[in-house]
Amino acid sequence: MCIRDRLISELNENKGSTSLSFRQKMSEEAFTETASYDAMISNYFIEKNKTSFPNKKVISTNLVEKLRYGENPHQIASIYSYSLSTNLDQLHGKKLSYNNYNDIYAALNASKSLPAGVGTVIVKHANPCGVSINKNKVGSFKEALSSDPISAFGGIVSCNFKINIKLAAELSKTYFEVIIGNGYEKDAIRILKKRKNLRIIDSSKIKLENINSIVSNFNSLLIQSPDNKKFESKNFQVVS
């Protein structure tokens, strides 16, 4: 219901007046909106002046959706975004949970850091249990899966390339909670949709951005520059 309709309803219910609770709610929304606008201006000048860590940090985000619960059923949770959406397109499956989002972002941070078009990452409980670089799409997935097929069961697969029909058929052989692709062939989606509860995510709009990483603990925030270094095969050594 828009503010106008809420006001009309309030006036009708209170004989031309408004209740204290309504006025407090309107004050909350008004000051939140102006504070968000001021935060945008503040962050513009912080970026313009290249100030890494200002004396006061103002963060403004938008509610994307309220989630069923948090990491555990007794926790309440929501997801917010610096823009108006997460840029994740869900093509199929049940609604994403807090743990799904947590795993998805862990998987994307890893897969997007690999050379484009060849990287596959499998994540379980926000930790990678398989990573592969291979120009052959099916080969890339199979190598990642072979790293730890037991842990991979029920996990999340993130491919930094377009998923084709051959790979979709291979992915369907193992139970996964979420499949993330940088786009999909139509026939690939058709095959994956045969798994009713599988969440299919298109991440083609997601890019590694220069946004600080923030972790909250008690009354403090740990803030650091993003870990968006690109890795290549030459960066790794087999030591045993």
Question: Which functions belong to the PLM regions below?
Answer:
Residues S36-I41, F45-S240:
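ATP-dependent carboxylate/acyl-activation modules
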Residues M1-I3:
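Short, small-residue-biased leader/transition segments that mark boundaries at the very start
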Residues D5, S9, I79-Y82:
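Short, compositionally biased low-complexity segments
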Residues R6-N49, N55-I59:
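Cofactor-pocket helix-loop regions in the catalytic cores of large enzyme subunits
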